[in-house]
Regions:
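Active-site HxH/HxHxD metal-binding segment of metal-dependent hydrolases
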Residues: 93-100, 113-178, 190-191
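Cap/insert and terminal regions of metallo-dependent hydrolase folds
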Residues: 4, 8-12, 16, 148, ...
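N-terminal export signals
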Residues: 2-6, 12-33
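Pre-active-site segment of Zn-dependent metallo-hydrolases
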Residues: 53-60, 80-126, 137-142, 196-198, ...
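Catalytic core of the metallo-beta-lactamase
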Residues: 71-79, 178-241, 254, 261
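Metallo-beta-lactamase
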Residues: 42-63, 151-217, 295-319
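C-terminal segment of N-terminal export signals and the immediately downstream linker at the start
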Residues: 6-7, 28-61, 67-69
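Active-site metal-binding loops of divalent metal-dependent hydrolases
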Residues: 89-91, 130, 192-193, 223-225, ...
Length: 320
């Protein structure tokens, strides 16, 4: 045997083969969440991501209006009477853990309506909690301008702070006046029913919804939430011109996300005029069919269809 060459180890070879075969069988057949997660990642490999149905043009938005567009998942771009707000930005093809050579996590089912390079300079970024589908470090590092940031309690350590003019964490029922070059805005954190851990062990991280007020006009952002009577209590902070509520990832219920019907009911309890369904048509995070959340939302509002502000990624709404 040549010097330095290791002898062939038949037992090690067989053991490695059996281990790989077992892992493959487990991934293919197991009903566990982890096996389904890896099966989904394998299916995504090489899959094209379709373009969003609509593409907003913020350069044409009028500053005296209240205008917003759904960019995908929970990400909303708002022109709040001249002040640009971006909520829970996820603007890249995949979310999850950054491994250096790539990101391990779900791939988008639909492209964002706008990429970071397409955004106007942002004045304020809101982050409701630290879950990867709401707090995406790559997206937060790519926001144009030098915005202020308001985040849920104990989440700002995940933010690339050098890109931001100021960073403020809020606990439930705390509020702050955020001053920007385009004027001020009041942000209040509200309690919702969810959880904040990013990697399961950091259960101390906060989570919240937000109420945003400017010149007497108010918007309610529900973040992620399960069904809760809290939104009836939040009514006292209204009236709200629109409630931005999650309607997807409810099957199974253990993820603590409300159903579309529950989301509509909570927005009604809060007294919101318009309903904006979020958290669907973007990532496969649960078991319900792709279009089921919006179909159930439309059915829940069948008697008041004018209250449904939008249904497609990229759609733009103007509230004069």
């Amino acid at each position: 045997m040549p010097p330095g060459k290791r002898p062939f180890n038949r037992r090690l070879f067989l053991a490695q083969g059996l281990l790989l075969a077992g892992a493959g069988a487990w991934t293919a057949l197991s009903s566990s969440w982890y096996a389904r997660f890896f099966r989904e990642r394998i299916r995504e490999f090489g899959r094209d991501i379709p373009l969003a149905p609509q593409r907003p043009d913020p350069t044409r938005w009028i500053d005296r209006d209240l205008t917003f567009s759904w960019l995908g998942h929970a990400c909303i771009l708002v022109n709040f009477k001249g002040l640009r707000i971006l909520v829970d930005p996820t603007l890249y093809p995949r979310i999850g853990v950054n491994l250096g050579l790539g990101t391990l996590g779900p791939q988008r089912l639909m492209s964002p309506a706008l990429l970071p390079m397409d955004l106007p300079d942002i004045d304020l970024v809101l982050v409701t909690h630290a879950h990867f589908d709401h707090l995406d470090a790559a997206s937060l590092a790519s926001i144009p301008g030098r915005p202020a940031a308001v985040m849920a309690h104990a989440t700002s350590d995940l933010l690339p702070r050098k890109r931001y003019s100021s960073v403020r964490e809020l606990r439930w029922n705390e509020s702050a006046v955020i001053e920007t070059p385009r004027g001020g805005v009041t942000v209040r954190a509200i309690e919702v029913k969810h959880w904040g851990a990013r990697i399961r062990r950091d259960t101390w991280r906060g989570y919240a919804g937000f109420i945003v007020e400017r010149d007497g006009r108010k918007l309610l952002f529900g973040g992620d939430t399960a069904e809760t009577p809290l939104f009836a209590e939040h009514r006292r902070w209204g009236p709200f011109e629109a409630a931005f509520m999650p309607v997807g990832a409810y099957n199974p219920w253990i993820w603590n996300h409300c159903t579309p019907e529950q989301a509509v009911a909570m927005a009604q309890a809060a007294g919101a005029v318009h309903f904006v369904p979020l958290h669907h048509q973007t990532f496969r995070l649960s078991n319900e069919p792709f279009l089921e959340p919006i179909e159930r939302t439309q059915a829940a509002l069948a008697r008041e269809p004018e209250r449904l502000a939008l249904s497609q990624i990229g759609q733009t709404v103007v509230l004069t």
